[in-house]
Amino acid sequence: APSALTVQAEEADAAQTAEVSGVEYQIYPTPHEMTYQDGGFDIGEVNIVYENGVDDVTKNRMTEVLSIKGKSESAAVTNAKVDGKTNILAGIYGSDGYVDKYVKEHYTVDKSLFDHHGSYFLASNKGEIVILGLDTDAVFYGITSLKHIFNQMDGTTIRNFEMRDYADVNIRGFIEGYYGLPWSNEDRMSLMRFGGDYKMTSYIFAPKDDEYHKGKWRDLYPEEELAKIKEMVKVGNDSKCRFVWTAHPFMGGFNQAQADQEIQALLRKFDQLYDAGVRQFGVLGDDVGSLPRTIVINMMTKVSEWAKKKGDVDRKSVV
């Protein structure tokens, strides 16, 4: 026969489950699909399974989320589910890895979900949480949704649910390109961290108080200024609201008679910033004026070729 303590524990679990059944979580941007199931469970000692394609930044996000409920330090990382623990599985769709196979075997997820930008499946179900993303960034977005939920949970009890979500546009973020009071670097980094909490992808750096973006776009940054760029790049990488460096060459006296040399100067500048860790670049063309379009086309062709040779530059240029 069960002991009095066992009965009390079961009654407490039942009360928690009943209480959480009416909970609905507020997540922004609003997920495309969120369905709730009856009941929930208490998050106990955590076991995490990561597939190989999940990057360190995404793992760090998981640690951050677990720390909200004091679960990060005791969490273990293994290669498979562990009985008696709260298992959190994070993997990539189509990888044929442990999590990819597990989700296909235990959940119903239409493959068309993964035709969309940043798509992921997130489920909380009877002692386990699973995140299956289109890529490691999408897994990060799923864990970020979990962060929203953890911040709203009363205690460590989470409701059973399934979420299917994706982005309607590929580039999501903000640009600093106005002529008013400039932001400080602390402002910029704070905004990237904020953007990372809302699944933004990009902070487009185009401040008009930075002469090396505008009037001195040909000139390399001094080391002191480059160090500041490196710091912002790191925050962008860590938040996945990535730092996008742009040049404004057509406002800065572009010499069309020496267009080839001007383009080479721009690529040298890009090389310097690439070495500083920047992997997203843009060219602002809003002041192109009467410049022959063939020059602009040639510039962007050369920029695209440069990015392709680098191999790891995001080739979505901003024009």
Whereabouts are the PLM-identified features?
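Active-site cleft segment of glycoside hydrolase catalytic domains centered on the general acid/base Glu
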Residues: 258, 285-311
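Conserved small/polar residues in nucleotide/adenosyl-binding loops
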Residues: 318
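Acidic, contiguous N-terminal accessory segments
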Residues: 10-126, 154-164
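C-terminal segment of classical bacterial N-terminal signal peptides
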Residues: 1-8
